[in-house]
A protein has these predicted regions:
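Hydrophobic, aromatic-enriched alpha-helical segments typical of multi-pass transmembrane helices
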Residues: 2-198
Length: 198
């Protein structure tokens, strides 16, 4: 039980970091009228867009690296805690792959950036559905993985298909769903601590 609470706190920190990273990504688009531009790079194959200068890309995308690591830490910590889905924790492989895909997108933008959003969304939909069925988390907390997973499919992907451009401002809003998941994980760790003390 103590280990589970520790892993849930770690997941909370990871998802809070990821959510903050998404919000920081969106900030310039919301308030500074930033324009989303494609970085300098070239297509190696028809669907692999590699950035010209990986070091400059890494320096410019440090927040994306932290966000990706936060998503990875959150998913791995859920795996270790066995929550919120109990024995079906193999479903967490999908959001782990999404986090790794986002990490690779720092250098190889296509196909890894959209694949990261898709895998994180799909993975959290699967985890969210399993969380609702497992009923390990109580109240509103059990729905938070599903909210994080549905966000790109309800908001980001439709806008991408309608406008033909990456919806950078909306991608930033995804941070609120990840922060909500981090808060739910933190509160669940406190519930476990309270049960231990009783």
């Amino acid at each position: 039980m103590e280990k589970s609470a520790m892993y849930l706190r770690r997941a909370a920190i990871g998802y809070l970091l990821a959510g903050s990273g998404f919000l920081l990504f969106g900030f310039p688009f919301w308030f500074l009228h930033a324009v989303d531009k494609m970085p300098a790079g070239r297509f190696i194959l028809p669907f692999f867009f590699v950035l010209d200068d990986p070091l400059a890309a890494f320096q410019a995308s440090w927040m994306q690296v932290l966000t990706s690591l936060g998503l990875l830490v959150g998913a791995v910590s859920f795996w270790q805690a066995g929550e919120p889905i109990g024995p079906k924790r193999t479903l967490l492989i999908v959001p782990m792959a999404g986090a790794l895909s986002y990490l690779l997108a720092v250098w190889i933008l296509l196909p890894f950036a959209p694949m990261g959003a898709f895998l994180n969304g799909l993975g959290m939909i699967l985890v969210g559905y399993a969380s609702i069925k497992a009923a390990i988390w109580t109240d509103w907390k059990r729905y938070t993985p599903l909210i994080a997973g549905l966000f790109p499919f309800v908001f980001m992907f439709p806008l991408r298909f309608l406008t033909g451009a990456r919806p950078a401002a909306v991608i930033g809003l995804w941070g609120f769903a990840w922060i909500l998941l981090g808060i739910a994980s933190w509160l669940r760790s406190r519930e476990i601590k309270a049960v231990q003390l009783a």
